Amino acid sequence: MHLAYPAVLSALLFCTGLYGVLARRNAILVLMSVELMLNAVNLNLVAFDVWLSRAAEETLHSGQALTLFTIAIAAAEIGIGLAIVLAVHRNRGTSDIDKLRDTAEGHEPDGPDTDTPATGTAAEKAEATA
């Protein structure tokens, strides 16, 4: 098999994962996109390892060993990441990244701006709302 096929597939997987990280707002979908990017890297590692071992006629397979190590680290990462997302969802009631960022900064995104001073008397405010 030619090296271009897995390299193109790996690039497509990585770009799909990158789009998911940049476009999604749900934390679980972002974690899934990161895993897709890691799998694209693993595919690239294995493809280049096979290609280089055929060219050099060696059977070291260090790329495949590195891929197994990466899979183990990714499994631990997704386990911890999902645990954190579930804990945050239980406490805050949402897993939307933008809403979590706004609540962490201490202000509501849809609320009025509190930096501007109030102008007018109470009678003017009551008249404006009526």
From Swiss-Prot:
Subcellular location per UniProt equals:
Cell membrane
Q: List the disulfide bonds.
A: none
Q: What does this protein do?
A: NDH-1 shuttles electrons from NADH, via FMN and iron-sulfur (Fe-S) centers, to quinones in the respiratory chain. The immediate electron acceptor for the enzyme in this species is believed to be a menaquinone. Couples the redox reaction to proton translocation (for every two electrons transferred, four hydrogen ions are translocated across the cytoplasmic membrane), and thus conserves the redox energy in a proton gradient.
Instruction: Show the NCBIfam families listed in the entry.
Output: PRK05715.1-2
Where are the compositionally biased (Low complexity) regions?
114-123
Enumerate the InterPro entries for this protein: NADH_UbQ_OxRdtase_chain4L/K (IPR001133), NUOK/Mnh_C1-like (IPR039428)
Q: What class of enzyme is it?
A: translocase
Q: Which sequence ranges are marked TM in the entry? A: 3-23, 28-48, 68-88
EC code: 7.1.1.-
Cellular component per GO, a single term: plasma membrane
Q: This chain belongs to which protein, by name?
A: NADH-quinone oxidoreductase subunit K 1
Keyword vocabulary terms for this entry: Cell membrane, Membrane, NAD, Quinone, Translocase, Transmembrane, Transmembrane helix, Transport
Indicate, by first and last residue, each region the UniProt record lists as having compositional bias (Basic and acidic residues).
97-110
GO MF assignments = NADH:ubiquinone reductase (non-electrogenic) activity; quinone binding
Similarity annotation = Belongs to the complex I subunit 4L family.
What's its membrane topology?
Multi-pass membrane protein
Which gene is the coding source of this polypeptide chain? nuoK1
Stretches for region Disordered: 97-130
Q: Which reaction does it catalyse?
A: a quinone + NADH + 5 H(+)(in) = a quinol + NAD(+) + 4 H(+)(out)
Q: State the signal peptide span.
A: none
> How is the subunit organization of this protein annotated in UniProt?
NDH-1 is composed of 14 different subunits. Subunits NuoA, H, J, K, L, M, N constitute the membrane sector of the complex.
One BP annotation, GO: ATP synthesis coupled electron transport
